[in-house]
Protein backbone atom coordinates (compact mmCIF):
# COMPACT_ATOMS: atom_id res chain seq x y z
CA UNK A 1 0.00 0.00 0.00
CA UNK A 2 1.43 3.38 -1.03
CA UNK A 3 1.02 6.24 1.45
CA UNK A 4 2.75 9.39 2.74
CA UNK A 5 4.71 10.17 5.87
CA UNK A 6 1.85 12.32 7.16
CA UNK A 7 -0.70 9.55 6.59
CA UNK A 8 1.52 6.77 7.90
CA UNK A 9 0.05 7.14 11.40
CA UNK A 10 -3.17 5.67 10.00
CA UNK A 11 -1.29 2.46 9.13
CA UNK A 12 0.30 1.42 12.41
CA UNK A 13 1.59 -2.17 12.29
CA UNK A 14 0.90 -2.32 8.56
CA UNK A 15 3.29 -2.58 5.64
CA UNK A 16 3.35 0.50 3.41
CA UNK A 17 5.46 2.01 0.64
CA UNK A 18 6.50 5.66 0.75
CA UNK A 19 8.21 7.68 -1.97
CA UNK A 20 10.83 9.82 -0.24
CA UNK A 21 14.19 11.52 -0.34
CA UNK A 22 17.05 10.64 2.01
CA UNK A 23 17.97 13.73 4.04
CA UNK A 24 20.59 12.05 6.21
CA UNK A 25 21.65 8.67 7.56
CA UNK A 26 23.72 7.09 10.29
CA UNK A 27 24.54 3.55 11.30
CA UNK A 28 25.72 1.73 14.38
CA UNK A 29 27.07 -1.57 13.19
CA UNK A 30 24.03 -3.75 12.69
CA UNK A 31 21.41 -0.98 12.43
CA UNK A 32 21.09 1.84 9.87
CA UNK A 33 18.90 4.87 10.50
CA UNK A 34 17.51 6.67 7.46
CA UNK A 35 16.09 10.19 7.79
CA UNK A 36 13.37 10.40 5.16
CA UNK A 37 11.21 13.21 3.83
CA UNK A 38 8.45 13.23 1.24
CA UNK A 39 7.04 16.77 1.31
CA UNK A 40 4.36 15.91 3.87
CA UNK A 41 6.83 15.43 6.70
CA UNK A 42 10.03 13.84 8.01
CA UNK A 43 10.31 10.29 9.36
CA UNK A 44 12.97 7.84 10.45
CA UNK A 45 13.40 4.52 8.73
CA UNK A 46 15.18 1.79 10.71
CA UNK A 47 17.05 -0.94 8.83
CA UNK A 48 18.06 -3.90 11.00
CA UNK A 49 20.74 -6.06 9.37
CA UNK A 50 19.40 -9.33 10.78
CA UNK A 51 15.88 -8.65 9.47
CA UNK A 52 16.55 -7.70 5.82
CA UNK A 53 18.39 -9.12 2.84
CA UNK A 54 22.11 -8.38 2.79
CA UNK A 55 21.69 -6.22 -0.33
CA UNK A 56 19.08 -4.03 1.39
CA UNK A 57 21.33 -3.35 4.37
CA UNK A 58 24.31 -2.65 2.11
CA UNK A 59 22.19 -0.19 0.12
CA UNK A 60 20.98 1.50 3.31
CA UNK A 61 24.58 2.20 4.32
CA UNK A 62 25.71 3.37 0.87
CA UNK A 63 22.78 5.40 -0.44
CA UNK A 64 23.68 9.07 -0.81
CA UNK A 65 22.04 12.17 0.65
CA UNK A 66 19.00 13.43 -1.32
CA UNK A 67 18.70 10.28 -3.42
CA UNK A 68 15.06 9.51 -4.18
CA UNK A 69 13.66 6.18 -3.03
CA UNK A 70 10.69 3.94 -2.62
CA UNK A 71 10.93 2.59 0.91
CA UNK A 72 8.73 -0.28 2.07
CA UNK A 73 8.30 -1.38 5.66
CA UNK A 74 6.12 -1.62 8.75
CA UNK A 75 4.93 1.50 10.56
CA UNK A 76 5.55 1.17 14.31
CA UNK A 77 5.10 3.44 17.30
CA UNK A 78 8.09 5.47 18.49
CA UNK A 79 7.46 7.85 21.38
CA UNK A 80 10.87 9.49 20.93
CA UNK A 81 9.90 10.75 17.49
CA UNK A 82 8.14 14.08 16.91
CA UNK A 83 5.64 12.11 14.83
CA UNK A 84 5.19 9.28 17.31
CA UNK A 85 6.03 6.60 14.74
CA UNK A 86 8.77 5.32 12.45
CA UNK A 87 9.24 2.68 9.75
CA UNK A 88 10.90 -0.71 10.16
CA UNK A 89 12.34 -0.91 6.67
CA UNK A 90 12.09 -4.14 4.67
CA UNK A 91 13.12 -3.04 1.19
CA UNK A 92 14.57 -0.02 -0.64
CA UNK A 93 14.24 0.85 -4.32
CA UNK A 94 16.42 3.67 -5.62
CA UNK A 95 14.61 5.94 -8.07
CA UNK A 96 17.46 8.38 -8.69
CA UNK A 97 20.82 8.53 -6.97
CA UNK A 98 22.09 11.99 -5.98
CA UNK A 99 25.80 12.76 -6.30
CA UNK A 100 27.77 15.32 -4.27
CA UNK A 101 24.78 17.12 -2.79
CA UNK A 102 26.16 20.58 -1.91
CA UNK A 103 24.27 21.23 1.35
CA UNK A 104 25.83 18.68 3.67
CA UNK A 105 24.86 18.31 7.36
CA UNK A 106 27.71 20.66 8.40
CA UNK A 107 27.11 24.40 8.92
CA UNK A 108 27.02 26.66 5.87
CA UNK A 109 27.06 30.44 5.51
CA UNK A 110 23.91 32.36 4.60
CA UNK A 111 25.19 33.46 1.18
CA UNK A 112 26.04 29.86 0.28
CA UNK A 113 22.59 28.72 1.36
CA UNK A 114 20.91 31.54 -0.58
CA UNK A 115 22.93 30.62 -3.69
CA UNK A 116 21.46 27.14 -3.27
CA UNK A 117 18.00 28.28 -2.21
CA UNK A 118 16.42 25.80 -4.63
CA UNK A 119 17.96 23.05 -2.49
CA UNK A 120 17.90 24.76 0.91
CA UNK A 121 14.10 24.68 0.74
CA UNK A 122 14.35 20.93 1.38
CA UNK A 123 15.79 21.36 4.87
CA UNK A 124 13.63 20.68 7.89
CA UNK A 125 13.49 24.26 9.19
CA UNK A 126 12.90 25.83 5.79
CA UNK A 127 10.18 23.26 5.15
CA UNK A 128 8.56 24.26 8.45
CA UNK A 129 8.62 27.97 7.56
CA UNK A 130 6.95 27.30 4.21
CA UNK A 131 4.27 25.20 5.91
CA UNK A 132 3.54 28.09 8.27
CA UNK A 133 3.43 30.48 5.32
CA UNK A 134 0.90 28.18 3.67
CA UNK A 135 -1.20 28.10 6.85
CA UNK A 136 -1.20 31.90 7.07
CA UNK A 137 -2.49 32.04 3.49
CA UNK A 138 -5.11 29.36 4.13
CA UNK A 139 -6.32 31.10 7.28
CA UNK A 140 -6.44 34.40 5.39
CA UNK A 141 -8.84 33.04 2.80
CA UNK A 142 -10.87 31.39 5.54
CA UNK A 143 -11.23 34.66 7.47
CA UNK A 144 -12.18 36.87 4.55
CA UNK A 145 -14.52 34.37 2.94
CA UNK A 146 -16.32 33.79 6.24
CA UNK A 147 -16.64 37.55 6.80
CA UNK A 148 -18.30 38.17 3.44
CA UNK A 149 -15.36 39.60 1.50
CA UNK A 150 -15.08 39.07 -2.26
CA UNK A 151 -11.63 38.32 -3.66
CA UNK A 152 -10.57 40.70 -6.42
CA UNK A 153 -7.34 40.48 -8.42
CA UNK A 154 -5.85 43.92 -9.16
CA UNK A 155 -3.37 44.27 -12.05
CA UNK A 156 0.39 43.91 -11.61
CA UNK A 157 1.15 46.39 -14.42
CA UNK A 158 -0.17 49.86 -13.59
CA UNK A 159 -0.06 53.40 -14.97
CA UNK A 160 -0.38 55.03 -11.54
CA UNK A 161 0.85 54.40 -8.03
CA UNK A 162 -0.83 54.73 -4.62
CA UNK A 163 2.23 56.34 -3.05
CA UNK A 164 4.12 58.02 -5.91
CA UNK A 165 6.64 56.53 -8.34
CA UNK A 166 9.98 57.00 -6.59
CA UNK A 167 10.11 53.40 -5.35
CA UNK A 168 8.55 51.72 -8.38
CA UNK A 169 10.02 49.49 -11.04
CA UNK A 170 9.51 51.12 -14.43
CA UNK A 171 8.90 49.24 -17.67
CA UNK A 172 7.53 49.97 -21.13
CA UNK A 173 3.98 48.94 -21.95
CA UNK A 174 4.34 49.09 -25.73
CA UNK A 175 4.53 52.89 -26.28
CA UNK A 176 3.44 53.81 -22.74
CA UNK A 177 5.17 53.96 -19.37
CA UNK A 178 4.09 51.34 -16.85
CA UNK A 179 5.08 50.31 -13.35
CA UNK A 180 5.10 47.08 -11.38
CA UNK A 181 2.45 47.36 -8.69
CA UNK A 182 3.42 48.39 -5.19
CA UNK A 183 -0.18 47.96 -3.99
CA UNK A 184 -3.57 47.00 -5.37
CA UNK A 185 -5.28 49.53 -3.12
CA UNK A 186 -6.63 51.99 -5.69
CA UNK A 187 -8.21 49.20 -7.71
CA UNK A 188 -9.58 47.56 -4.60
CA UNK A 189 -11.27 50.82 -3.64
CA UNK A 190 -13.06 50.72 -6.99
CA UNK A 191 -14.03 47.08 -6.40
CA UNK A 192 -15.31 47.90 -2.91
CA UNK A 193 -17.80 50.31 -4.48
CA UNK A 194 -19.16 47.31 -6.40
CA UNK A 195 -18.92 44.54 -3.79
CA UNK A 196 -18.84 46.31 -0.41
CA UNK A 197 -15.96 44.32 1.11
CA UNK A 198 -13.09 43.02 -1.01
CA UNK A 199 -9.62 41.59 -0.54
CA UNK A 200 -6.66 40.66 -2.69
CA UNK A 201 -3.56 38.52 -2.34
CA UNK A 202 -0.64 39.03 -4.67
CA UNK A 203 2.94 40.18 -5.24
CA UNK A 204 4.05 43.76 -4.80
CA UNK A 205 7.32 45.39 -5.78
CA UNK A 206 9.30 48.13 -4.03
CA UNK A 207 12.50 49.51 -5.57
CA UNK A 208 13.89 50.29 -2.12
CA UNK A 209 17.65 50.08 -1.72
CA UNK A 210 17.29 48.56 1.72
CA UNK A 211 19.28 45.70 3.22
CA UNK A 212 17.50 45.30 6.56
CA UNK A 213 16.19 42.01 7.87
CA UNK A 214 12.64 43.32 7.38
CA UNK A 215 12.78 44.21 3.67
CA UNK A 216 12.31 42.34 0.41
CA UNK A 217 12.20 43.85 -3.08
CA UNK A 218 9.32 41.57 -4.04
CA UNK A 219 6.86 40.51 -1.39
CA UNK A 220 3.28 39.32 -1.12
CA UNK A 221 0.55 41.41 0.41
CA UNK A 222 -2.96 40.76 1.65
CA UNK A 223 -5.09 43.87 1.17
CA UNK A 224 -8.64 44.62 2.24
CA UNK A 225 -11.01 47.48 1.42
CA UNK A 226 -14.38 48.00 3.07
CA UNK A 227 -17.17 50.40 2.03
CA UNK A 228 -19.38 52.03 4.69
CA UNK A 229 -16.63 51.44 7.26
CA UNK A 230 -14.94 53.93 9.57
CA UNK A 231 -11.43 53.91 10.99
CA UNK A 232 -12.34 52.34 14.34
CA UNK A 233 -14.29 49.55 12.63
CA UNK A 234 -11.37 48.89 10.30
CA UNK A 235 -8.99 48.43 13.24
CA UNK A 236 -11.36 45.86 14.72
CA UNK A 237 -11.37 43.90 11.46
CA UNK A 238 -7.58 44.01 11.28
CA UNK A 239 -7.04 42.74 14.81
CA UNK A 240 -9.65 40.01 14.36
CA UNK A 241 -7.89 38.92 11.18
CA UNK A 242 -4.41 38.79 12.71
CA UNK A 243 -5.70 36.97 15.78
CA UNK A 244 -7.44 34.41 13.58
CA UNK A 245 -4.24 33.78 11.62
CA UNK A 246 -2.10 33.37 14.74
CA UNK A 247 -4.59 30.97 16.34
CA UNK A 248 -4.77 28.93 13.14
CA UNK A 249 -1.00 28.54 13.04
CA UNK A 250 -0.89 27.59 16.73
CA UNK A 251 -3.55 24.96 16.13
CA UNK A 252 -2.43 23.53 12.80
CA UNK A 253 1.37 23.96 12.81
CA UNK A 254 2.38 22.63 16.23
CA UNK A 255 5.13 20.42 14.81
CA UNK A 256 6.51 23.18 12.57
CA UNK A 257 6.67 25.63 15.48
CA UNK A 258 8.46 22.97 17.54
CA UNK A 259 10.99 22.38 14.75
CA UNK A 260 11.67 26.12 14.64
CA UNK A 261 11.96 26.22 18.46
CA UNK A 262 9.41 29.03 18.55
CA UNK A 263 8.40 30.26 22.00
CA UNK A 264 4.66 29.86 21.45
CA UNK A 265 3.78 31.50 24.77
CA UNK A 266 4.32 34.85 23.05
CA UNK A 267 1.85 33.93 20.31
CA UNK A 268 -0.68 32.51 22.74
CA UNK A 269 -1.03 35.98 24.30
CA UNK A 270 -2.26 37.48 21.03
CA UNK A 271 -5.93 38.37 21.51
CA UNK A 272 -8.28 41.22 20.71
CA UNK A 273 -8.39 44.08 21.37
CA UNK A 274 -4.81 45.08 20.53
CA UNK A 275 -3.27 48.02 22.40
CA UNK A 276 -3.53 51.39 20.67
CA UNK A 277 -1.23 54.38 21.05
CA UNK A 278 -1.44 57.63 19.11
CA UNK A 279 1.55 58.96 17.22
CA UNK A 280 1.65 61.92 19.63
CA UNK A 281 1.74 59.65 22.68
CA UNK A 282 4.30 57.39 21.00
CA UNK A 283 6.63 60.37 20.55
CA UNK A 284 6.25 61.24 24.23
CA UNK A 285 6.87 57.62 25.24
CA UNK A 286 10.06 57.43 23.17
CA UNK A 287 11.33 60.67 24.69
CA UNK A 288 10.71 59.25 28.15
CA UNK A 289 12.70 56.15 27.16
CA UNK A 290 15.70 58.27 26.21
CA UNK A 291 15.26 58.46 22.44
CA UNK A 292 16.51 61.90 21.38
CA UNK A 293 16.71 61.13 17.65
CA UNK A 294 13.00 61.52 16.87
CA UNK A 295 10.88 64.66 16.64
CA UNK A 296 7.19 65.22 15.94
CA UNK A 297 6.61 65.01 12.19
CA UNK A 298 9.26 62.35 11.57
CA UNK A 299 8.55 58.72 10.79
CA UNK A 300 9.59 56.00 13.19
CA UNK A 301 12.62 53.84 12.51
CA UNK A 302 13.09 50.21 13.47
CA UNK A 303 14.48 50.96 16.97
CA UNK A 304 11.50 53.20 17.74
CA UNK A 305 8.94 50.64 16.59
CA UNK A 306 10.71 47.90 18.55
CA UNK A 307 10.71 49.95 21.75
CA UNK A 308 7.00 50.70 21.45
CA UNK A 309 6.04 47.09 20.66
CA UNK A 310 8.26 45.69 23.41
CA UNK A 311 6.54 47.95 25.92
CA UNK A 312 3.28 46.12 25.24
CA UNK A 313 4.78 42.73 24.26
CA UNK A 314 1.84 42.43 21.86
CA UNK A 315 0.94 43.70 18.41
CA UNK A 316 0.17 47.40 18.87
CA UNK A 317 -1.58 49.96 16.66
CA UNK A 318 0.18 53.32 16.32
CA UNK A 319 -2.56 55.68 15.15
CA UNK A 320 -2.98 59.13 13.62
CA UNK A 321 0.37 59.90 12.03
CA UNK A 322 1.18 63.41 10.74
CA UNK A 323 -0.39 64.17 7.37
CA UNK A 324 2.92 65.20 5.81
CA UNK A 325 4.54 61.77 6.20
CA UNK A 326 1.60 59.74 4.88
CA UNK A 327 0.18 59.21 1.36
CA UNK A 328 -2.29 61.56 -0.31
CA UNK A 329 -5.37 59.37 0.01
CA UNK A 330 -5.69 59.29 3.82
CA UNK A 331 -8.64 60.96 5.54
CA UNK A 332 -7.83 63.92 7.82
CA UNK A 333 -8.32 63.39 11.53
CA UNK A 334 -11.28 65.64 12.50
CA UNK A 335 -9.78 66.11 15.98
CA UNK A 336 -6.44 67.31 14.59
CA UNK A 337 -6.13 68.02 10.88
CA UNK A 338 -2.35 67.91 11.07
CA UNK A 339 -2.81 64.15 11.38
CA UNK A 340 -4.72 61.51 9.44
CA UNK A 341 -7.00 58.60 10.37
CA UNK A 342 -4.47 55.83 9.91
CA UNK A 343 -2.69 53.12 11.85
CA UNK A 344 0.35 50.91 11.54
CA UNK A 345 0.23 47.57 13.33
CA UNK A 346 3.64 46.87 14.87
CA UNK A 347 4.52 43.27 15.67
CA UNK A 348 6.45 42.56 18.89
CA UNK A 349 9.96 41.11 19.16
CA UNK A 350 11.44 43.57 16.67
CA UNK A 351 9.56 42.47 13.54
CA UNK A 352 8.19 45.93 12.84
CA UNK A 353 5.17 47.06 10.87
CA UNK A 354 3.07 44.21 9.51
CA UNK A 355 -0.06 46.22 8.59
CA UNK A 356 -0.57 49.73 7.29
CA UNK A 357 -4.11 51.03 6.94
CA UNK A 358 -6.29 54.11 6.93
CA UNK A 359 -9.65 55.64 6.32
CA UNK A 360 -9.64 56.95 2.74
CA UNK A 361 -10.48 60.47 1.61
CA UNK A 362 -14.06 60.29 0.30
CA UNK A 363 -14.53 63.96 -0.70
CA UNK A 364 -13.74 64.77 -4.35
CA UNK A 365 -12.49 68.33 -3.81
CA UNK A 366 -10.17 67.31 -0.99
CA UNK A 367 -8.78 64.39 -2.99
CA UNK A 368 -8.16 66.62 -6.03
CA UNK A 369 -6.34 69.04 -3.74
CA UNK A 370 -4.21 66.22 -2.28
CA UNK A 371 -3.28 64.93 -5.74
CA UNK A 372 -2.01 68.40 -6.69
CA UNK A 373 -0.17 68.90 -3.40
CA UNK A 374 1.72 65.65 -3.93
CA UNK A 375 2.63 66.59 -7.50
CA UNK A 376 0.79 63.64 -9.02
CA UNK A 377 -0.57 63.46 -12.57
CA UNK A 378 -4.30 64.07 -12.22
CA UNK A 379 -5.00 62.32 -15.52
CA UNK A 380 -3.33 59.13 -14.31
CA UNK A 381 -5.66 59.14 -11.30
CA UNK A 382 -8.85 60.13 -13.13
CA UNK A 383 -10.46 56.72 -12.54
CA UNK A 384 -9.64 57.00 -8.84
CA UNK A 385 -11.20 60.46 -8.66
CA UNK A 386 -14.30 59.07 -10.41
CA UNK A 387 -15.00 56.98 -7.33
CA UNK A 388 -15.70 60.23 -5.46
CA UNK A 389 -17.90 61.58 -8.25
CA UNK A 390 -20.35 58.71 -8.36
CA UNK A 391 -21.73 57.73 -4.98
CA UNK A 392 -18.74 58.19 -2.69
CA UNK A 393 -19.01 56.66 0.78
CA UNK A 394 -16.81 56.45 3.88
CA UNK A 395 -14.43 53.55 3.37
CA UNK A 396 -11.25 52.08 4.80
CA UNK A 397 -8.53 49.68 3.83
CA UNK A 398 -5.30 48.05 4.91
CA UNK A 399 -2.44 45.91 3.66
CA UNK A 400 -0.60 43.14 5.51
CA UNK A 401 2.89 42.06 4.45
CA UNK A 402 2.89 38.28 4.30
CA UNK A 403 6.61 37.68 4.72
CA UNK A 404 7.02 39.90 7.78
CA UNK A 405 3.96 38.31 9.35
CA UNK A 406 5.32 34.81 8.71
CA UNK A 407 8.72 35.85 10.10
CA UNK A 408 7.10 37.08 13.30
CA UNK A 409 4.89 34.01 13.77
CA UNK A 410 7.73 31.62 12.89
CA UNK A 411 10.30 33.47 14.96
CA UNK A 412 12.88 33.50 12.14
CA UNK A 413 15.41 36.31 12.14
CA UNK A 414 15.21 37.49 8.51
CA UNK A 415 12.31 37.76 6.07
CA UNK A 416 14.42 36.14 3.32
CA UNK A 417 13.61 32.76 4.89
CA UNK A 418 9.86 33.35 4.60
CA UNK A 419 9.77 33.64 0.79
CA UNK A 420 10.45 30.54 -1.31
CA UNK A 421 12.76 32.47 -3.64
CA UNK A 422 13.40 35.90 -2.07
CA UNK A 423 14.28 38.93 -4.13
CA UNK A 424 16.77 41.11 -2.29
CA UNK A 425 18.79 44.17 -3.23
CA UNK A 426 21.73 42.00 -4.28
CA UNK A 427 19.87 38.84 -5.27
CA UNK A 428 17.86 37.97 -8.36
CA UNK A 429 18.97 34.31 -8.49
CA UNK A 430 17.85 31.61 -8.18
Curated annotation (Swiss-Prot):
It holds the Pfam family tRNA-synt_2. Keywords: Aminoacyl-tRNA synthetase, ATP-binding, Cytoplasm, Ligase, Nucleotide-binding, Protein biosynthesis. CDD domains: AsnRS_cyto_like_N, AsxRS_core. PROSITE patterns: AA_TRNA_LIGASE_II (PS50862). Its main location: cytoplasm. It is found in: Cytoplasm. Its EC number is 6.1.1.22. It catalyses: tRNA(Asn) + L-asparagine + ATP = L-asparaginyl-tRNA(Asn) + AMP + diphosphate + H(+). One of its GO terms (cellular component) is cytoplasm. One of its GO terms (biological process) is asparaginyl-tRNA aminoacylation. GO terms for molecular function: asparagine-tRNA ligase activity; ATP binding; catalytic activity, acting on a protein; nucleic acid binding; transferase activity. PANTHER family: ASPARAGINE--TRNA LIGASE, MITOCHONDRIAL-RELATED, ASPARTYL/LYSYL-TRNA SYNTHETASE. Belongs to the class-II aminoacyl-tRNA synthetase family. Homodimer. This is Asparagine--tRNA ligase.
Amino acid sequence: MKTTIKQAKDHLNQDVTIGAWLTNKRSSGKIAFLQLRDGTGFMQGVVVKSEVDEEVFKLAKEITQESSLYVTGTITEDNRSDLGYEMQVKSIEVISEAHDYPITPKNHGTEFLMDHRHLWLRSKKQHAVMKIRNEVIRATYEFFNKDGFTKVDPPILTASAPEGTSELFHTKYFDQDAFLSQSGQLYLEAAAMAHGKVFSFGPTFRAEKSKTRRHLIEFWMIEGEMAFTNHAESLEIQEQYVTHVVKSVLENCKLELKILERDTSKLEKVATPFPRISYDDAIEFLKSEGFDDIEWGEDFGAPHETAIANHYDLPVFITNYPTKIKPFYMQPNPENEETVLCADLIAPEGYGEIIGGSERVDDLELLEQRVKEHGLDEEAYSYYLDLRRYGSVPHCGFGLGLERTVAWISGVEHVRETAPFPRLLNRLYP
